[in-house]
Design a protein with these regions (language model features):
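Short, flexible/disordered intra-domain loops and linkers
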Residues: 1-18, 174-176
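Extracellular S/T/G-rich loop segment that most often corresponds to the catalytic His/Ser-adjacent loop
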Residues: 16-143
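An often Trp-containing, charged/polar helix-loop segment at the C-terminal end
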Residues: 149-176
């Protein structure tokens, strides 16, 4: 599986994969490769996710994890949830530190502030995102498929993914 990060550079499982229109990447034309795009919570393409006809499936990767402002100020861009996952222990390590607003020094993500009743020790982050989050989700789905039937071929896997997926974001204006 290949994924594309928001930095428009190499950020993947294979050196050389680029992050503009996925249709231009010849690696995605290999039949046993599954190109994965990212969706946000509303079921439309994430702002950073690569478009292209060579993508096979989308998984939830969210946006940037902004939520209720801990500082009392509105969050720029509104609510943009990402994925919830475990993080390094403590409020001074891991991704929980990314909720700090550089300008004010205040934590702008209430879940990662240490004051949220379900995350007082900051053992979880709500800002895991991107196609690098969507791809492992799809890999997990494939692992469950293969656990249920280990005789599936790569063609079977791709067929099941296609047959059980639904088209998303079809009415959105194309910007590429």
């Amino acid at each position: 599986m290949y994924y594309c990060g928001p930095n428009y550079g190499v950020n993947n499982l294979a050196v050389g994969f680029r992050c503009w229109d996925a249709s231009f990447d010849t690696k995605l034309t290999v039949p046993y490769v599954i190109g994965v795009a990212s969706l946000k919570e509303s079921g439309v393409r994430s702002s950073y996710s690569t478009p292209g006809s060579s993508l096979w499936v989308s998984g939830f990767g969210g946006e940037y994890g902004n939520n209720q402002s801990y500082s009392g100020f509105p969050v720029v861009g509104g609510n943009n949830p990402a994925l919830m996952t475990t993080d390094q222990s403590s409020c001074s390590a891991g991704y929980v530190r990314t909720g700090i607003d550089v300008g004010t020094g205040l934590n702008i993500n209430s879940f990662q502030s240490g004051s949220h009743p379900e995350n007082q020790n900051c053992n979880y982050t709500s800002t895991a995102n991107g196609t690098s989050a969507a791809t492992p989700t799809i890999s997990g789905v494939i692992a469950l498929m293969l656990e249920a039937n280990n005789n599936l071929t790569w063609r079977d896997v791709k067929h099941i993914l296609a047959a059980t997926s639904e088209q998303i974001d079809s009415s959105r204006q194309k910007t590429y």
